[in-house]
Amino acid sequence: MDFTNLKNTDPELLDMIKKEEERQEYNIELIASENFTSLSVMEAMGSLLTNKYAEGYPHKRYYGGCEFVDEVEDLARERLKKLFAAEHANVQPHSGSQANMAVYMSVLQTGDTILGMDLSHGGHLTHGSPVNFSGKLYNFISYGVDKETETIDYEQLKKIALENRPKMIVSGASAYPRIIDFQKIREICDEIDAYMMVDMAHIAGLVATGLHPSPVPYADFVTTTTHKTLRGPRGGAILCKEKYAKAVDKAIFPGIQGGPLMHTIAAKAVCFGEALREDYKEYMQQVVKNTKVLGEELKNYGFRLISGGTDNHLLLIDLTNKNITGKDAEKLLDSVGITVNKNTIPFETLSPFITSGIRIGTPAVTTRGFKEEEMKKIAYFMNYSIEHREENLSQIKEQIKEICKKYPLHQNA
């Protein structure tokens, strides 16, 4: 990108950006929730739309001069509805967490009981963690995975739901590598007359391209982030049935937010447009292929995959048999140029600051053009680095840098 002005006005900050640019360019990015946006997304994010205040919704604003940003928001909403065949869309949430908060506030009262997936079993902070607003404002109870299969225990979920009769059941996850049966969860919700909310932040790209069953026909509310597999700007969005549209919109504004970020909404419109193209479907298909190959290769090296494998874009790896913690593995792999994150595993015995596992995903490297052969190399690099962690690994770091040079971040820039 052109940083001509920043170079003159704030070289100190520009230096920091350049260092991060170099890190992204020459590291293998395996954090499952990260991706690389297109230059078009970044251009929209950096546009003068950032100057415009637009409290309210299109054609019903509290400020004048909104006729063109109204067009932008309408475009983003219509593209998002088309992408997921949804009745209503709100593109104003600043983040996935705020999208979740707005849904809770739209139909629930403080103290209401909600059933969500346990964070250590793959859920998310906003699904009831006691350190999060969700766990503080609502009476969250949790379901998790079966100890043997390490997949969602739907019988346990049903049993807990029948015993506690929550007002809402939340599904979706941040570290769950398998298909989620939304139809089964809908049936449980109907049995106890509960709202159904799905947080599809991680799998939105798979849902958009038919690689994961869509929650939209089943759920009352579906939330997502717009980065991750959707490859857009950092932000959130809400889809819902038309009958909840007013309640959801009011919960976002004036409920928990003021003015929307119009430059971000423009960038969301770009990413939704990109996701409607055929080449995006091919990209997501490659993400799934890459993740499966990476998982199989790691298994061949003796790594234990939670649930035995993957159906989506991520892998959760139990490192116990490798005699290294998630924290130490994250630091070690970072030193050679592979970026991962430490992650708790189901029935975790270590602190969330240490962890027994790591979570990895392929959306970012697939955006760069990595395919199956590169996945085999990544598995080799990971295994070699962990097995030879007491040795000098400079040759691995150099090999990683060479692969990254072959696949620049923006090949047509």
Curated annotation (Swiss-Prot):
GO terms for molecular function: glycine hydroxymethyltransferase activity; pyridoxal phosphate binding. Its EC number is 2.1.2.1. GO terms for biological process: glycine biosynthetic process from serine; tetrahydrofolate interconversion. (6S)-5,6,7,8-tetrahydrofolate binds at residues 119, 123-125, 351-353. GO terms for cellular component: cytosol. It comes from the Bacteria. Pathway: One-carbon metabolism; tetrahydrofolate interconversion; Amino-acid biosynthesis; glycine biosynthesis; glycine from L-serine: step 1/1. CDD domains: SHMT. It is found in: Cytoplasm. PROSITE patterns: SHMT. Homodimer. Belongs to the SHMT family. PANTHER family: SERINE HYDROXYMETHYLTRANSFERASE, SERINE HYDROXYMETHYLTRANSFERASE 1. This is Serine hydroxymethyltransferase. It comes from Clostridium botulinum (strain Loch Maree / Type A3). The lineage of its organism: Bacteria, Bacillati, Bacillota, Clostridia, Eubacteriales.
